[in-house]
Amino acid sequence: MSSDYSNISELIEEEYNNSKSVGIFVSRFDKSEGVGTVVNRHISELNDAGIDVTLFAYEQVDEIAEKKVVNVSSSLTGNNTLNKLISSMNPLKWLSLSSELKKLDLLIVHQPILCSIAYYAQKIHDIDTIYYNHEVTRPEDKVGTIQRIYGYTLFQIYLHISSRLDQIVSVSKYSQQEYSRRFDRQGMVIHNSIDHEMYNQSVDGSRIREKYDLEDDPLVLFVGRIAKSKGIHRLISVFEDVSKTIPDATLVIVGRPDNQGYYQRVKVLSKSVDQQIIFAGIVPEEDLPAYYSAADLYATCSIKEGYNLTIAEAEACGTPTIAFDIGAHSEVMNDGVLVPKDNTSLFKEEMVSQLTKQR
């Protein structure tokens, strides 16, 4: 993979060398999610480069030791989505953030819903701004009535505002092409990076096998949100077919439910092979390398990905990977199996083939 810069700190050093204080905007800071993982690594990289970082977020799931966090959400309703929307289009909220914004040299925005605040800072306080494009989400991919309405209305406005920020950085050439097709702005590419000191082939996964009493059973792993776009229902259906050929196989799903309705749906789907599917929930990032190393195969049936860090993490740990040939997968995957989109029968055959090789 070729990038314009190897990481975010290199970009800032080369093009924003007077920036000593950076604000990072993210809707939900959750290190169990892809965007949250990227943001966390950006914070670490910038700190190592001697740059002060302030995190601006609507929701904060994970703590950041000794780092400044500014909550940009309102609390007018009991609905988080509505509170975010109210804050995002409320000029009084933007004004209330001015004292914090004026201290910064550069803003990096990771989601469209925060672009209105960044654009305000760009125009009023003359602060440099970067929109970090992970993917261009389609309105129909959003879950829930409020999210769908937002997707077809305000989201489109915020996405347009993102194109008015000073610089566009995409996490893959695929995401760059999708964005430039929409807004005729190319921007640059900085591929997401992983920590090779954490994710490498020397990691021992035996404690994960011991934890779930798997011994030498064939183990398939998925890491990510339990969301429709991640294709968990398809993965379970494919695994059900795989288990008919390899009856001692186990599927471990690591990650939090994105939507309770969908989570209940996949739990029902898993009933037929209930003893062979483990929903591990959220696990600490420091434990993830052991999960990858314990697995014989990393599998994802995701249908939209602007990057997909988990494939890169699995391969770094020496675990074979399989995925549909969608989004940026062909950029990320170095030595795995790409299956034509929606071809679940071939996906099953390749899973069986890969698991058989590992035995």
Swiss-Prot record:
Biological process according to GO: protein glycosylation; S-layer organization
Annotated EC: 2.4.1.-
Pathway(s) annotated for this protein in UniProt: Protein modification; protein glycosylation; Cell surface structure biogenesis; S-layer biogenesis
Disruption phenotype: Impaired formation of the tetrasaccharide present at 'Asn-532' of S-layer glycoprotein Csg. No effect on 'Asn-47' and 'Asn-117' glycosylation of S-layer glycoprotein Csg.
UniProt xrefs under Pfam families: Glyco_transf_4 (PF13439), Glycos_transf_1 (PF00534)
Keyword Hydrolase tagged: no
Presence of the UniProt keyword Transferase in the record: yes
InterPro entries from the UniProt entry: Glyco_trans_1 (IPR001296), Glyco_trans_4-like_N (IPR028098), Glycosyltransferase_grp1 (IPR050194)
A GO term, aspect molecular function: glycosyltransferase activity
Keywords: Glycosyltransferase, Transferase
PANTHER family: SULFOQUINOVOSYL TRANSFERASE SQD2
Protein purpose: Hexosyltransferase involved in N-glycan biosynthetic pathway that takes place under low-salt conditions (1.75 M instead of 3.4 M). Participates in the formation of the tetrasaccharide present at 'Asn-532' of S-layer glycoprotein Csg, consisting of a sulfated hexose, 2 hexoses and rhamnose. Involved in the addition of sugar 3 to the disaccharide-charged dolichol phosphate in the tetrasaccharide.
Entry similarity comment: Belongs to the glycosyltransferase group 1 family.
Protein known as: Low-salt glycan biosynthesis hexosyltransferase Agl9
Organism whose genome encodes this protein: Haloferax volcanii (strain ATCC 29605 / DSM 3757 / JCM 8879 / NBRC 14742 / NCIMB 2012 / VKM B-1768 / DS2) (Halobacterium volcanii)
